Amino acid sequence: MVRALLFHVITYTKFIVPVVKLLIMSAIAGVIAGAFGGGIGGVGDAIGTIIGDLERAIARFGGSIVNAFKTVIDKILTLAVRIGRIIEKYFRIAVHYIVLFLRLAYRYMYSFYTEFQKDPWRSLQFVGSMAILLNNSLFP
């Protein structure tokens, strides 16, 4: 019995105590590693939060710049549309008067042609007197 007791004590001191010490050491190392990991994780979370906040701030700043450009471009396009409408309006008026002038010129040319067929000498006198008047008005 003493021998069996000695065997158990030797086995306990040779094998079990070192294993228990290793388990305790590994538990302590695990706690320390967990603390370091948690600390490093906290630092990582803090850095991630800072970077995320900076990213959001930059995105808001960029968004405000884009909105400002959008507003300026919208105002420029609105002004361009208004100018285009004004040009279109006056272009229509100008085209109307040009067509009216061409109709009037056609009537006078037709009238002149028919008068020239009737009395060429009188028509040529009219053309000559008009040329003299125009020449005197252009080059006084």
UniProtKB/Swiss-Prot annotation:
Alphabetic keyword roster: Host membrane, Membrane, Transmembrane, Transmembrane helix
Compartments reported by the entry: Host membrane
Cellular-component GO terms for this entry: host cell membrane; membrane
Domain of life: Viruses
Main localization of the protein described in the UniProt heading: host cell
Residues annotated as transmembrane: 23-43, 93-110
Membrane topology classification: Multi-pass membrane protein
Protein known as: Putative transmembrane protein 49
Originating species: Sulfolobus islandicus filamentous virus (isolate Iceland/Hveragerdi)
